[in-house]
């Protein structure tokens, strides 16, 4: 994402992702990296990208901050419920219902999502999560959303039907689907997923890797 000229990366998983073979992680440039949790398919390229972007700031829950501060990265710790103002806008860390560990299975803190409140738009990035009633707190505590980025692959996270309900909970009409088709456990039927959203008057956007959109 890009807000106020700053490039924000979330959960970088490129190496080992068969759908992203056209992307060279060594060529990625960013100003911030936001991590929702520590699972391998969300941090696979973190250290390479951080090395190539030494001024980039890693933002995550306390345990993620502690792990990567020890590795020499610039970090900013957050925890759920808190806001912090960055140079592109302010961000709130919010609840996610999932698990979180580093690749060595050590504790990576609690999984989380983020709400980005910026002059260019308001975006909710849920991270990996199940449907939760806590999502109803987002429109009560945050500005109206322009876009929600929600997982739809089922098995490890919400499926499209639950994600469409999540879109109702957070009061957002445009949803960018994520966490689907990367491997066999989370392959989906695209038409069925789109129908789950359209039946609730919501738009589901299924982008190809390397694509871009404006909101």
Which ranges hold each PLM region?
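Active-site neighborhood of phospho(di)ester-bond hydrolases with catalytic His/Asp-centered motifs
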Residues: 9-11, 30-38, 57-61, 124-129, ...
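Pre-active-site segment of Zn-dependent metallo-hydrolases
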Residues: 2-38, 44-52, 99-105, 129-143
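Zn-dependent metallo-beta-lactamase
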Residues: 1-9, 14-18, 92, 174, ...
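Active-site environment of divalent metal-dependent phosphoester hydrolases
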Residues: 16-17, 39-44, 65-67, 82-85, ...
